[in-house]
Amino acid sequence: MAGISETGHLKVVTNFESLITSATAFGESYNPSTAGIKLLALQTLLTDSKASIDAVNIALIAYSNAVGVREAVFMPFSKLITRINSSLKASGATVQVINNAQTIVRKLQGKRAGTTLNEEEIKALEAGGDVVNQISVSQLSYDSRLGNFDKLITLLLSVPLYNPNEEDLKIESLKTLYAEFNARNNDVLTASIQLSNARIARNDVLYKPLTGLVDVATQAKLYIKSVFGATSPQYKQISKLNF
């Protein structure tokens, strides 16, 4: 299941619908004693399967939209941090405060205190199976950005000299912006959970042992094979439908 693409799941459902079409066309010859593969049961399972596919598609669109909104909200973030940093430096704050701020700013902008990895860092990364020249040492995940932005605001609150005239750099404005960032990040988290739940439900309908579409379809194919024979045109009609 994990390796099946969204189109792969849809193909399984499409093949199942073709199987039902063939079984229906067989007329009275398709008359299984097993309740789970009777035509009415197959039609019900097909309806549920299509609904589960639709639910994933809807959740996927909602997730993509939430990600897009979050990206748009965060787009000016790095430039804002640069302006905050410059304003703090111009405020007359102590060297210690400035240095503390730089640690946070580097994390927010994905910059290291040093420009190269030392030998111990390289060995540690290689031991973990990482390719050193592709290692990202930034902390640019959205959760990390939010955490570090909150730390920066807390630091600014402790600096009486940080009192810019620029409205968007004022601490209250930064708090409001943080709340907006956090809300949009939570929107993505919520959408991702809903998408995950939709996929779990779909996988249950399609792949649950015995009652899922795949096992039911396989059982129906075996029944058709038993009725008409392995070399019959009826069985050949459905034998290439993969599940």
Where are these regions (language model features)?
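Basic/polar low-complexity intrinsically disordered segments
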Residues: M1-F243
